[in-house]
């Protein structure tokens, strides 16, 4: 399939309560309003058997070894990826609310080896664009429902932020378009910036892999 016909693979990352999920939905709605084919994917996908186990972990209903939960997060992405490829080949732009970068950033924040954290997702498709919504963890902590899940603690989020900054540097050196936006701006302003970035992203004929 030519690059003119395939869909784009767009990832939006951010700290918890950064407004990421809202922006993902706004982007999908915008693309559809422009008569483009678009679909939203949220990771973790809590509807699958693996996703339900992750959901229990995040809600602190069960305890799991850090390595085990990291591999479950990765498996949750792998079990969806064939469908994402199929959609992209049909010309559907796929918007991902979190991806492998979150897996690395959060697990490494718990002290797991950096390269080990990256390894389970090697081979997943490389996005055409990654947008990181940057917000001060202390500001995010003031937003509604903060603290309901395991990782929603300021100290943890500060470590995750540093890891995202490291990921951006490493992947940009590999040629990935990885952009940071100030998520403390208004909802409308952030949305407008995201739409501009997505509209102007350069795509290759085929997706590379991580």
Curated annotation (Swiss-Prot):
Positions with a binding annotation for ATP: 14-21
Recorded metabolic or biological pathway in which this protein acts: Pyrimidine metabolism; dTTP biosynthesis
GO cellular component, one term: cytoplasm
Top-level taxon of origin: Eukaryota
Enzyme Commission code(s) on record: 2.7.4.9
GO biological process: dTDP biosynthetic process; dTTP biosynthetic process; dUDP biosynthetic process
Class of the enzyme per the UniProt entry, highest EC level: transferase
Reactions this protein catalyses: dTMP + ATP = dTDP + ADP
Keywords, ordered alphabetically: ATP-binding, Kinase, Nucleotide biosynthesis, Nucleotide-binding, Transferase
Alphabetical list of Pfam families matching this protein: Thymidylate_kin
GO molecular function, a single term: dTMP kinase activity
Record function comment: Catalyzes the conversion of dTMP to dTDP.
Alphabetical list of HAMAP family matching this protein: Thymidylate_kinase
Family: Belongs to the thymidylate kinase family.
Protein name according to UniProt: Thymidylate kinase
Gene of this entry: tmp1
